[in-house]
Structures are given as structure tokens and as C-alpha cells.
Amino acid sequence: MSLDFNTLAQNFTQFYYNQFDTDRSQLGNLYRNESMLTFETSQLQGAKDIVEKLVSLPFQKVQHRITTLDAQPASPNGDVLVMITGDLLIDEEQNPQRFSQVFHLIPDGNSYYVFNDIFRLNYSA
């Protein structure tokens, strides 16, 4: 893989959130049967169940605004960990919700897939 892990993380994140914000039903090719999503308190495994969960979320319009993006190599095999924080604008809400998301990306030929995906809304105390 010719991309360094920071460039990979930036490219992946831009693609993922652009796809999520325009048509999240098309995210299935980023996951595999062994992939796992933890979305708040729900845990799902497999691309089909993950996409069904994402499509069922109760909003029509969404926009992710990334505040921070950190990446690290996760193994000698080329795995990459990506942590994102940002703001989530849902439907016509004026006040964004804060979120955090972590991706564990695994090399697959000339590309990567999401092995683990952890999403959490961050509420102020």
C-alpha cells in the first residue's frame, strides 16, 4: 500500500462521511461479514446488518463536520486505527450534536475495509 496511514485516514474519512451524508445505503462495500459496529449501545455484526442499522436511523438529512482526525498504524500487517471527533447536523436542527467515531481499517488487496466501527454521541454534562 503506497499511502501513508495519515493520508489513508483522511481519504477514507472524507469518502465515508460524504457517502453517509448523501446515501448511507451504499456503505455496505466498506464492511465485511466479520465487521462489527457499535452504535451507541447497539452492537451489530456483518455488512448487511450494519447497513440496515445505518439506513434505519431516524433522520432524513445529515451532515458530518470533522473537528479532529487522528490515525495510527494498528499492526505490522498495515491495519490503521482512525479516531474522529466532530459535529453532526441532523435535519433542520440549528444546534449540532457532538460525536466521536473510531474505525479499525484492515488491508484487503489494494484497498481497506472497516473491521471495527464505534460511534458515540457526546453529551455535555
UniProtKB/Swiss-Prot annotation:
Swiss-Prot/TrEMBL GO biological process terms: nucleocytoplasmic transport; protein import into nucleus
CDD domains, per database record: NTF2
Record keyword Membrane present: no
InterPro entries: NTF2, NTF2-like_dom_sf, NTF2_dom, Nuclear_transport_factor_2_euk
Pfam families with a match to the protein in the record: NTF2
Domain NTF2: 8-121
Primary location recorded for the protein, binned into one broad class: cytoplasm
Compartment(s) of residence: Cytoplasm
Cross-link (Glycyl lysine isopeptide (Lys-Gly) (interchain with G-Cter in ubiquitin)): K53
GO cellular component, one term: cytoplasm
Signal peptide per UniProt: none
GO molecular function, one term: small GTPase binding
Keyword Translocase part of the UniProt annotation: no
Residue list for modification N-acetylserine: S2
Described purpose of this protein according to its UniProt entry: Facilitates protein transport into the nucleus. Interacts with various nucleoporins and with Ran-GDP. Could be part of a multicomponent system of cytosolic factors that assemble at the pore complex during nuclear import. In vitro, the NTF2-Ran-GDP association, in the presence of GTP, triggers dissociation of the karyopherin alpha-beta complex, allowing nuclear translocation of karyopherin alpha and the NLS substrate.
PANTHER family from the UniProt entry: NUCLEAR TRANSPORT FACTOR 2
Protein known as: Nuclear transport factor 2
Source organism: Saccharomyces cerevisiae (strain ATCC 204508 / S288c) (Baker's yeast)
UniProt lineage: Eukaryota, Fungi, Dikarya, Ascomycota, Saccharomycotina
